[in-house]
Amino acid sequence: MKRAFLNIAICALLGTMFVGCKAFHTIQSGENATGKPYELVVVCAQQAWISELGDTLQAILKQPVAELPIYEPMFDVMRILPNNFKSLTERHRNILVVNVSPDIKEPALAVKYDATAKPQVYIVAQGPDNHTLAQYVSENRENLLYVLEKAERDRRVSYASAFPSQSLTPLVEQMFSVKMPIPDD
């Protein structure tokens, strides 16, 4: 009887350790985001990517940065298939997930911050078909770009505040009477 009770207690203890141990959780929202500034992971099925929807997304996201004398895309777009969207890519700093399904009634764009990493912007574009979603994304292109650009600016400001230059920040304050953190790079 004692032996059976001891075996049950050990199994319960081991089970609790496995469930509670953070090593078995692949994603935590406290993890640092990966990726370079202005880099975007687009999670999109091949059929949607080679359609009007994919062309629309590329035209919006890869449009040239204004006021530059040579072509430079607004975002470096990396498209991956949904089945390849796993732990490392889920922690990217900018993610756009494209979901096309006849079960979806109306097209929509949804934004979530710090979904699987910090700092992160996680956007879901969904619609009933490629054509309808392409139209919706095109009509809301300014909102899409605003969210992505603002996230990048906010990250840069946060970095500058966290790691101000020890030589430049006091110099700017002395010369212009403005206290503003300036990063070294």
Where do the model's predicted regions map?
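Bacterial Sec-dependent N-terminal signal peptides
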Residues: M1-E31
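N-terminal targeting sequences that direct proteins away from the cytosol to non-cytosolic compartments
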Residues: C21-D185
